């Protein structure tokens, strides 16, 4: 199976799980709380190489993953809907799509609130003040509330790459240097 087909398959699985979680959260009236718990889980994944390995490695059995996730949700106080959901995902050996599930849930929650989502790539993590300022600037441009998904990619060297729908604004230092390099080649 080509790589593109595999990523679509993973995306489909993530969207189905996220949709199920969203419907349960909507019924319970806890979309915000579930979103906050998922944000905490994503932060834990981003901050721990061992947890990332547990999620993506097929070496761990479903039972090992279940026990680890159960301990994690208990230790960090992630209970109720998200805690049970994570256990089901682990039991079904679908932890490898957890980051995709979290992204898809955020999109569903944003759509439910009438927000649009901007994917932002930055060379460094944004401070809460920078994120708030970026949201305000994007709201001024789009006229809608904007939810921001920030990805850190040191290879862009500096600046931001912002994607909103089909539009992309690339102010990264890497792109500026590439443009300058091309301009110098044309001159020389």
UniProtKB/Swiss-Prot annotation:
Tell me where it resides.
Answer: Cell inner membrane
Predominant location category = membrane
**Has keyword NADP?**
no
Topological type in the membrane: Peripheral membrane protein
- Coiled-coil residues are none
Which InterPro entries does the entry link to? ATP_synth_OSCP/delta_N_sf (IPR026015), ATPase_OSCP/d_CS (IPR020781), ATPase_OSCP/dsu (IPR000711)
Q: Got a GO cellular component term for this one?
A: plasma membrane
Task: Briefly state the protein's biological role.
Answer: F(1)F(0) ATP synthase produces ATP from ADP in the presence of a proton or sodium gradient. F-type ATPases consist of two structural domains, F(1) containing the extramembraneous catalytic core and F(0) containing the membrane proton channel, linked together by a central stalk and a peripheral stalk. During catalysis, ATP synthesis in the catalytic domain of F(1) is coupled via a rotary mechanism of the central stalk subunits to proton translocation.
Q: NCBIfam families, per this entry? A: ATP_synt_delta (TIGR01145), PRK05758.3-2 (NF004406)
Q: How is this protein named in the record?
A: ATP synthase subunit delta
Where is the organism placed in the taxonomic lineage, from the top? Answer: Bacteria, Pseudomonadati, Pseudomonadota, Alphaproteobacteria, Hyphomicrobiales
